[in-house]
Amino acid sequence: MAISAVTNDQAVGRMLNEILDSNGNYTEFQFRRVIGEIAKVPGHVRKQMLYTMLYAAVGELREAKNQAAHISLSEGTAAEFLAAAAYHAANMLTEASRYIRRVPVEAIVALEASGFALLNAQGTFSFELMELLMNKTNAHAGNKEQFGGSLAFAKMLKSHGIPEDHVRSYVEECLAAVSPWYEGKGKSVVTGHTVDDVEKKAIVDIYLPAEPEEFGDIMVALSS
């Protein structure tokens, strides 16, 4: 049986997942080890993407945004994919959406990267791209269960005449409001969206690791 070598990308991905799963309980050694592995990854854009994801994973949002800002797109379509992923990790949803929407749908299909693009479109509230991709790749039936909540969310926005970029801006404002509870604390925040059971309310979810006594202050920050 042949054993394939583990690439630097795979090693970094595994280490990043360990840090994310630790809920802030990672060691300085773990952090430095990831830094060292990223340095071995070929390609400037790929390096910057991984640095961005690392700093976002540990709640160092300013540094994550700084790393994302240094991404050069001279490498073409693949670089735009990576830039979108990096900006998404840094909670820069508008920038992430801009880059993922710059990749032609035909190129996404040719690269067999529709799954990656769909996840980025979903995470950055880029519903027009999501619907276009699902139609172009004939993937609507296969992905309906996974992306059904997003499609219902998009349908509700359309019915009320709410542009998707307004939603992105709103979510970014919410993330900025709660940043004191995770930025610099080794924690990361995740967003999601769906509709209620009777499809009368569009719901944006923000998953933030926090202590029970912090809940009240977080709710006040979100509502102000």
Question: Where are each of the predicted segments found?
Answer:
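A short interface-forming secondary-structure element
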Residues: 202-215
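N-terminal low-complexity, intrinsically disordered segments
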Residues: 130-164, 195-196
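Helical scaffold of the NTase/Pol beta-like nucleotidyltransferase catalytic core
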Residues: 151-183
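Acidic, proline/glycine-rich low-complexity IDRs
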Residues: 1, 44-45, 223-224
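Long, contiguous interaction/recruitment modules in multidomain scaffold/adaptor proteins
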Residues: 1-11
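Short edge beta-strands and adjacent turn/loop segments
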Residues: 180-202
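Short, non-transmembrane amphipathic alpha-helical segments
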Residues: 214-224
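Alpha-helical protein-protein interaction scaffolds
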Residues: 11-12, 18-141
